[in-house]
Amino acid sequence: MSTLPLLLHSVSYSGSWGQTALSVEQFAGKAASLDFDGVMLMAKRPHLSPLDFDAARRRQLRDHLAAAGLRHNVLAGYTNFTADLEHAEVPQREMQIHYVEALAELGADLGAPYVRIFTGYEHPAAPFSAQWRLIVDALGECARRAARCGVTLLLQNHHDVAAGWESFRDLLSEVNDPHLKAGFDAWAPALHGDDLAAAATALAPWMAHTTVADYVRRPRHRYEPALVNYVPVTPNVQAVPFGEGFIDYRAFFGAAVQAGYTGGVAYEMCSPLLGGGAEENLDRYARAFVAWMRAR
């Protein structure tokens, strides 16, 4: 694990959940100072929206990343191909495919060979089988368009459709395009109660990247006055320093590396942390991740 490239996700310093916010240039300097090999850049405002980066600004950012010694860089796109299915007259899929193509062009200009994307959240306006077909078709077109830019897409197992690792593997197999790889994470199968080693072994042939964070479960209960008692509800999942949570990353990485995985590992702080969102606490979490990975 100590040989895998380590990336810091810029969502961690984006202010998205009330934490310290840095500009994309400030963030790159931060990642370099924390001894990361590269960055995963949030491809939307306030960091890296294609709307805000013309050719000159792209060249400046590429030079900035190179000067900081950040060589392993990925763009993080945000897609939901099943969005707004109740309004068929709006070309949502076309707009999102165009967004992904714009990110592929942006990645090529920055020297970033990968763009992360998602599937879709299940929508009540269409049967599951129709949503699956829609996503397969959209992913295939996105992959073909990315290939023209010399960029490969990373599909992350995050949204509802194909969240389970077996379904995720099925989806990748059905699209069957060399420019669509797996950005397969341990987080979802860990929450599902799956065997992480088995999941990593099964997905290893498709894996080119993974994004990580660690969590603990905190029980929640709702008081029922008529019963003078509490009713359990879905636990909260709280972000904690890497290696201190319930996700068995030793098993996940051990199996992935044994199966031949050599891709990058991006650390993200995308939800409230124990200790808060001050820059010092964000830095502490990032250092803990680097130390954990480099010690193994």
PLM regions: where:
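Active-site groove signature of glycoside hydrolases
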Residues: G107-F128, C149, L154-H158, Y267
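N-terminal pre-domain/capping segments
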Residues: M1-A108, A130, A147, D177, ...
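Short acidic/polar active-site loop segments enriched in Thr and Asp
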Residues: D37, R71, P113, A208, ...
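Active-site cleft segment of glycoside hydrolase catalytic domains centered on the general acid/base Glu
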Residues: P124-L139
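A short, acidic, amphipathic alpha-helical segment used as a generic capping/interface helix at domain edges
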Residues: E244-Q258
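A short, acidic, flexible beta-alpha connecting loop/helix-capping segment that sits on the rim
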Residues: A266-N281
